[in-house]
């Protein structure tokens, strides 16, 4: 199991956030690659708990040579939201100054996807590890 810490610059001077990535299983491009993430909605913690326990099971499977896929796991995908606590309550999905919900107001990507072959090409690129 390989653990990688990814540093993301914060939006104010001197701040940064960490994402942890785990790569588990054979590094064989012919095998399926499975991406798992949890904690995108920072206040929703059951997925993080599941991945916490799954990591131990996958590590045991890797050590015994039983895994037939490569797993890429981000057990907590929203470090900004996880760090937002006010008055002893988790505020994870709201921008503290504006009150905007981080889980809403996303760009409409339909046009871009339609012009570039839809999700099929995106999925193929993600599974192949291509950065194009």
What kind of feature is each model-predicted range?
Residues 1-132:
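Structured catalytic-domain cores with a bias toward divalent-metal coordination
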């Amino acid at each position: 199991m390989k653990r990688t810490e990814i540093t993301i610059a914060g939006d104010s001077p001197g701040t940064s956030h960490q994402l942890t990535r785990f790569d588990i299983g054979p590094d064989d491009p012919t095998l399926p690659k499975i991406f798992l993430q949890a904690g995108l909605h920072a206040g929703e913690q059951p997925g993080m708990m599941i991945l916490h326990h799954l990591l131990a099971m996958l590590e045991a499977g890797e050590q015994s040579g039983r895994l037939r896929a490569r797993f890429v796991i981000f057990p907590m995908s929203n470090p900004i939201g996880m760090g937002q606590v006010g008055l002893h309550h988790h505020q994870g999905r709201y921008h503290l100054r504006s009150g905007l919900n981080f889980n809403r107001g996303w760009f409409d990507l339909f046009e871009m996807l339609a012009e570039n072959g839809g999700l099929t090409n995106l999925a193929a690129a993600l599974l192949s590890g291509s950065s194009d």
